[in-house]
From Swiss-Prot:
Main location: cytoplasm
Alphabetized Gene3D superfamilies for the sequence: translation initiation factor eif-2b, domain 1, Translation initiation factor eif-2b, domain 2
Reaction catalyzed: 5-(methylsulfanyl)-alpha-D-ribose 1-phosphate = 5-(methylsulfanyl)-D-ribulose 1-phosphate
Site feature: Transition state stabilizer: 166
UniProt cross-references to NCBIfam families, sorted A to Z: eIF-2B_rel (TIGR00524), PRK05720.1 (NF004326), salvage_mtnA (TIGR00512)
Localization in the cell: Cytoplasm; Nucleus
Domain of life of the native organism: Eukaryota
KW Ubl conjugation (keyword) present: no
GO MF, any single term: S-methyl-5-thioribose-1-phosphate isomerase activity
Protein name: Methylthioribose-1-phosphate isomerase
Originating species: Aedes aegypti
Hydrolase found in the keyword field: no
Pfam families: IF-2B
Length: 360
C-alpha cells in the first residue's frame, strides 16, 4: 500500500509533514486557510496536485462549521480565500486552476435562485471533497498511459530501468502519484527492473521523499547524486526518464523542479526518451511558452544550510530558483490521464478535449 499524505474526513484535515521526512512521520492538523497557506508556502506539503488539494481542503475545513447569512456573503468569502491560497506558491498552476473552477462554481450557485445558502455551501464542499477521489483515479490513469507508452518501445516483454527526479508520488498527490505512478504501474506489471532517483538539491526531495516512498513500497531502487545523471546514462541502459510538472505551457515547455532541464539536455544527448507525467490540469494554454512562466525563488538558507548546520561559506551570494523550464524540443511525450501527447500537438489536442467536454 502506498503512503497516504493527506487525510480528510468531515471537516478535519491532516497532512504528513514532509519537512520531517524521512526521520519522522508526523501528521499535522490544518485548521483553516491560514494553516493551509503556511503548509504550502513552507513546503510541509508540496507537489502541484497536492498543493491544490490541500489548499482547497483547508478552505473546506474553514467553512465546514461556519454559518452564512447570504449566498453573496458566501461567494465573496470563498473567492477571497481561494485567491489568497494561490499566492502561497504561484508557479504550480493546479491551485490556480482549482481556484478558478471553484470561484466559477460559487458564482453559478449564487445565481441559482432555486437553492438556499446552506445548499450552496453543501454543494461547494462536495466539489472540494470529490477532488481527492478524482486525483487518485487520474493518477492511476496516468500510470497506465505512461507504462504503456514506455513499454511500447521495449521488445520481447523486457523489463526497464527508469530515472526520475524530485518527488511525484503519494507525497505529491492525493495518492499513487504521477511520474512515480508510472513507475508503480511498471512494477505492478512486473516490468520494472530498477528505478534511479536523484537527490534533488537543495531541498533533497528525491533523497528524503522519493527514496522514502520507494523503500516503503519495496521497489528496486538506487539513489544517485544530481550530478551523476550523465554517467548513469553512459554506463547503464536506462529506458526512459519520467518526471512530473508544476506547469506545462501551450507549446509543451515544462516547468518542474530545478535540475529537470539539465536532465533533459543530457537525455537528449544520450538518446534516452524523456517523458513528463502530469494531470491534465497542469497544462496551461494561457501560457504560450516556458519563458512566460513565473519561477519562484526560494530563500538562500535552503542552499546554505542542512537543517541547522551551515555548509556554505558565510557571506557568499546565492541564487535559488525552485524550478526550471525544460524546453519542448527535449520532451518525448507528455503523459496525462487523457492520453500521451507530443509537445508539437499538445495545444491542438488539449483544445479538442476541452471543446468536446464543453459540448457534453
Amino acid at each position: 500500500m502506498s503512503l497516504k499524505a493527506i487525510k480528510y474526513s468531515n471537516g478535519k484535515l491532516e497532512i504528513l509533514d514532509q519537512l520531517l521526512l524521512p526521520a519522522q512521520s508526523k501528521y499535522i492538523d490544518v485548521k483553516g486557510v491560514e494553516d493551509g497557506w503556511k503548509a504550502i508556502n513552507k513546503m510541509q506539503v508540496r507537489g502541484a496536485p497536492a498543493i491544490a488539494i490541500v489548499g482547497c481542503l483547508s478552505l473546506a475545513v474553514e467553512i465546514f462549521g461556519e454559518k452564512f447569512d447570504t449566498k453573496q456573503t458566501f461567494k465573496q468569502e470563498v473567492e477571497g480565500k481561494l485567491n489568497y491560497l494561490v499566492s502561497a506558491r504561484p508557479t504550480a498552476v493546479n491551485m490556480k486552476l482549482a481556484a478558478e473552477d471553484l470561484i466559477s462554481l460559487a458564482n453559478a450557485l449564487a445565481q441559482d435562485e432555486s437553492i438556499s445558502v446552506d445548499t450552496m455551501k453543501e454543494r461547494f464542499l462536495k466539489a472540494i471533497e470529490d477532488m481527492l477521489d478524482k486525483d487518485i483515479a487520474d493518477n492511476m490513469a496516468i500510470g497506465k498511459n505512461g507504462a504503456d507508452i514506455i513499454l511500447s518501445h521495449i521488445p520481447n516483454g523486457g523489463s526497464v530501468r527508469i530515472l526520475t527526479h524530485c518527488n511525484t508520488g503519494s507525497l505529491a498527490t492525493a495518492g499513487y502519484g504521477t511520474a512515480l505512478g508510472v513507475i508503480r504501474k511498471l512494477h505492478e506489471m512486473n516490468r520494472l527492473e530498477h528505478v534511479y532517483c536523484t537527490e534533488t538539491r537543495p531541498y533533497n526531495q528525491g533523497a528524503r521523499l522519493t527514496a522514502y516512498e520507494l523503500v516503503h513500497d519495496k521497489l528496486p531502487a538506487t539513489l544517485i547524486l544530481d550530478n551523476m545523471v550523465a554517467s548513469l546514462f553512459k554506463s547503464r541502459r536506462v529506458a526512459a526518464v519520467v518526471v512530473g510538472a508544476d506547469r506545462v505551457a501551450a507549446n509543451g515547455d515544462t516547468a518542474n523542479k530545478i535540475g529537470t532541464y539539465q536532465i533533459g539536455v543530457v537525455a537528449k544527448y544520450h538518446d534516452v526518451p524523456f517523458y513528463v507525467a502530469a494531470p491534465f490540469t497542469s497544462i496551461d494554454l494561457k501560457i504560450p511558452s516556458g519563458d512566460r512562466i513565473v519561477i519562484e525563488e526560494r530563500p538562500d538558507r535552503e542552499m546554505t544550510h542542512v537543517g541547522e548546520h551551515r555548509i556554505a561559506a558565510p557571506g557568499i551570494a546565492c541564487w535559488n530558483p525552485a524550478f526550471d523550464v525544460t524546453t519542448a524540443d527535449l520532451i518525448t511525450g507528455i503523459i496525462t490521464e487523457k492520453g500521451v501527447f507530443k509537445p508539437a500537438e499538445l495545444k491542438e489536442k488539449v483544445e479538442q478535449i476541452i471543446s468536446t467536454n464543453q459540448k457534453l
